[in-house]
Amino acid sequence: MSTVVVKGNVNGGVQQPRRRRRQSLRRRANRVQPVVMVTAPGQPRRRRRRRGGNRRSRRTGVPRGRGSSETFVFTKDNLMGNSQGSFTFGPSLSDCPAFKDGILKAYHEYKITSILLQFVSEASSTSSGSIAYELDPHCKVSSLQSYVNQFQIPQGGAKTYQARMINGVEWHDSSEDQCRILWKGNGKSSDTAGSFRVTIRVALQNPKYDSGPEPGPSPQPTPTPTPQKHERFIAYVGIPMLTIQARESDDQIILGSLGSQRMKYIEDENQNYTNVSSEYYSQSSMQAVPMYYFNVPKGQWSVDISCEGYQPTSSTSDPNRGRSDGMIAYSNADSDYWNVGEADGVKISKLRNDNTYRQGHPELEINSCHFREGQLLERDATISFHVEAPTDGRFFLVGPAIQKTAKYNYTISYGDWTDRDMELGLITVVLDEHLEGTGSANRVRRPPREGHTYMASPREPEGKPVGNKPRDETPIQTQERQPDQTPSDDVSDAGSVNSGGSTESLQLEFGANSDSTYDATVDGTDWPRIPPPRHPPEPRVSGNSRTVTDFSPKADLLENWDAKHFDPGYSKEDVAAATIIAHGSIQDGRSMLEKREENVKNKTSSWKPPLPKAVSPAIAKLRSIRKSQPLEGGTLKKDATDGVSSIGSGSLTGGTLKRKETIEERLLQTLTTEQRLWYENLKKTNPLAATQWLFEYQPPPQVDRNLAEKPFQGRK
């Protein structure tokens, strides 16, 4: 018996030659195809020796230089709105030392095959302007000549140039430039624009050996190196606190003293807590600007400050101690910002300040109050600068103003004044000692927080504290949310029934910063100038004085006072009729009425009181006699007919005769309460000036009774 061995696939002991052929074809198709890979120039790879075939010796030939391709990326930072310049691609490309002084010196020829020009915007959304750019493929233009291609400063953009556009098809000697890109901005010099990011791809061939300069004499023995000075690192982190007093959300608030603020202090690897001195940079009856002092050791420092301004309040009494009960909003005035200032001999330079703010939604409601009059929720800032301290000194940080008026009060209302704790935001101050040859001064601008808007920020440090004066002379809106229920600032109960009704101690101060009565006079008119009092006024006592800091009359009062001058040309009835005819909404009508009131109020800047009437010669003579020869003593001459009646010898008995009213008394009756108090105070210090002012005073014209009752019906 013989045995048969079958090799291959067997199915039930039966050979399958057709299947074997199919598998053989599949193996051939799955064989790995050879792949050619290009390697970077360097040490040649070791090859395996082939066996078999032609084993003759290898052919020898002249070695050829191998080409390579490299990619370089460089940036042009800190571009302003009006910056200009150019990029010359070749050995003149100083913005990319790795290309100019590095690989370009190792090859005879090069060509740039592509250029990617990107403009990265760092400007705010409200910035304007653009940066124009132009390609010069032959390096023959020295200034920008075409403004066709532009990058918008707020948006940024990118442009790619291929080899045929930048003269990159042919090879260039490594000592000549290939092309040039010129650019120029038309924005403002004070606005930050952004930066350029340039990516180039370079092909190189024919390497060469650069021996460099001849070596000099052998160096002396290297001295023992001195240990490098340690760069100190200091940081302050904390939330300043302030105690305020508030009563109702439609009332003003009272601020306490700032005092010392407790903050975390970090120096190198150690940390603890320290007290930071703080006080008010400026203060008025409507606002107060806080400031904080930070110590600076002797040396040169790079300083970074991050401020996140937010002013929540919390209760100080049980059982809700520490729980938030509202907030104090910020004003939208341009004079409210974070900034720094010099103190104790330090010098600040290279200041960069970016302030942002977040507005409140008009429908946002906190303690039954809305954000419909420009109130702000947050005010943030990032500040960086260099500070040099010849000796141990300090600088100060100034924050946005704390508003005292009811317009910015969003706290819970109580029946009486209660203490509240108010936070003034998170402050982080980092001081990094700046040594020569180090990069500790390099800082990157932090993008604004989501929902924040950039605002105009100062470029110079703040001056010295101004004390009890406004921080800026810019007028600030002071209207209240509910003027009918909110008393004016610094108003006491003096002169009311609670104080006995006495008005003798009332003192009127017209203007917040008025130093003398001359501030109330009008230049260019014949109105008399009241001389200042000979004695300084007594200090104001709380509860016995009343200060008028602002007078903002309404449109109705102005129209009743001078209907001819303050007439806007159309009445409220005309507005209502026009709204109905135009099928407008109630909101449209209200906005038109508000616009009409603004037009009336704007006319106050051009309104001047009427000039006083000419004084008759008789009155002038009477005044001169009264000044030079006052009547003193003496008796009236008795007439011969006195006591003799023309109807017999009867006489009057009982009763008293009514005294005749004098001219001075009649003039006093025309004065308002404020004018009468002014006159009485002046009379105590200078009676002659008070009498002169009284006789030259012209009372305002009487308002028609019909007009007073119906001011919008016109005169009859």
UniProtKB/Swiss-Prot annotation:
Composition-biased stretches (Polar residues): 475-506
Keywords, comma-separated and alphabetical: Capsid protein, Host cell junction, Host periplasm, RNA suppression of termination, Virion
Cellular component, GO annotation: host cell periplasmic space; host cell plasmodesma; viral capsid
Readthrough domain (RTD): annotated span: 210-716
Basic residues bias (residue ranges): 17-30, 44-61
Entry annotated with the keyword Disulfide bond: no
Annotated spans, Disordered: 1-69, 207-228, 438-547
Pfam families assigned: Luteo_coat (PF00894), PLRV_ORF5 (PF01690)
InterPro entries: Luteo_coat (IPR001517), PLrV_ORF5 (IPR002929), Viral_coat (IPR029053)
Bias kind Pro residues: ranges: 214-226
Region (Involved in the efficient long distance movement of the virus and the periplasmic subcellular location): 694-698
Composition bias type Low complexity, residue spans: 1-16
Site (Cleavage): R443, V444
Ranges of Basic and acidic residues composition bias in the record: 459-474
Domain of life: Viruses
GO molecular function, one term: structural molecule activity
Family: Belongs to the luteoviruses readthrough protein family.
Protein name per the record: Readthrough protein P3-RTD
